[in-house]
Amino acid sequence: MKVLGIETSCDETGVAIYDGSVRRLLGHCLHSQIDLHAAYGGVVPELASRDHIRRLPLLLKQLFGETGLSRRDIDAVAYTAGPGLAGALLTGASFAEAFALAAGVPALPIHHLEGHLLSPLLADDAPRFPFVALLVSGGHTQLMHVAGVGRYELLGESLDDAAGEAFDKTAKLLGLGYPGGPQLSALAAQGCAGRFKLPRPMLHSGDFDFSFSGLKTAVLNRVSSDDWEPGLAADLAADFQEAVVEVLCAKALAALKHTGLDTLVVAGGVGANRRLRERLDNLAARRRYRVCYPEPALCTDNGAMIAFAGALRLEAGERRAAAPAVRVRPRWPLVELDAPGCP
């Protein structure tokens, strides 16, 4: 069962083929729109949609060339149906449904966050259900209890800014370019944490929710003060990163203790953050917990995770008739996702 995956939820265009019969990713191609949006300091939805339209046929041709496969080899198409930018989602969904109709194969709308959540299972030493998942990206910060494919319970989430969003906004406050998160992390690596006393929002709230807007405001107050020196930006970046990482780690480990589980899956763009991985690994090792991540290349948005999620759903009994019905949900809570086989 070879599944073609298509990802266009924001500013990355991704295509991939996963073969469920041999449980192997056969190939994936990805195009980032960073250069396209850099001049604007953020993603411009209209430009993102147009670029997806241009790139999808080219990437698919490249993917078929690299894998030696063709349209006739594809058994199903999985595409990101939400959440994300409406126009960007529609480009991928339309392309996927048209391909599926022409090839006479089923098309499966996939939840973007489910793709991230399941991506660590692509590893050779994949975690087994059940586990706790920490989803950390530009748009979402959530802790989930994962009992199986499509069986998700929300334990806690950000009440305002997501962790990745806080990274991006703080990067702008420090005068860094786009994309802000990776640039802030790079700057933090040059600094020394401990100079600035920044808050750890909701660290002791007794639940699994997050809040990062107050931390961002603390940085704004610091850089707006009369005694601020730009030469201290690296130290401030390091302290900001430490504050976010400390809260993420504390909540994630508390969720493991609360559920009685011993495996944590970390997914989403912020999951590639080196300091987060370092601290989580150290803390988890002391408690004999296991922490699993996707490989760094699969932390950002990509088609591989969508193809894989589609393959798992088909394996679990999900069936979709090939039809030119484009289904997208720009706002789509993960807990509203049906388990495979549900009507």
Curated annotation (Swiss-Prot):
**What reaction(s) does this enzyme catalyze?**
L-threonylcarbamoyladenylate + adenosine(37) in tRNA = N(6)-L-threonylcarbamoyladenosine(37) in tRNA + AMP + H(+)
Sequence positions that bind Fe cation: 112, 116, 301
Q: How is the cofactor bound?
A: Binds 1 Fe(2+) ion per subunit.
User: How is this protein annotated for GO cellular component?
Assistant: cytoplasm
GO MF assignments = iron ion binding; N(6)-L-threonylcarbamoyladenine synthase activity
Recorded hits in Gene3D superfamilies, A to Z, give: 3.30.420.40
**Top-level taxon:** Bacteria
Query: Which key words tag this protein in UniProt?
Result: Acyltransferase, Cytoplasm, Iron, Metal-binding, Transferase, tRNA processing
Please give the family membership noted in the entry.
Answer: Belongs to the KAE1 / TsaD family.
* Identification of the protein by name: tRNA N6-adenosine threonylcarbamoyltransferase
- What is the organism of origin for this protein? Azoarcus sp. (strain BH72)
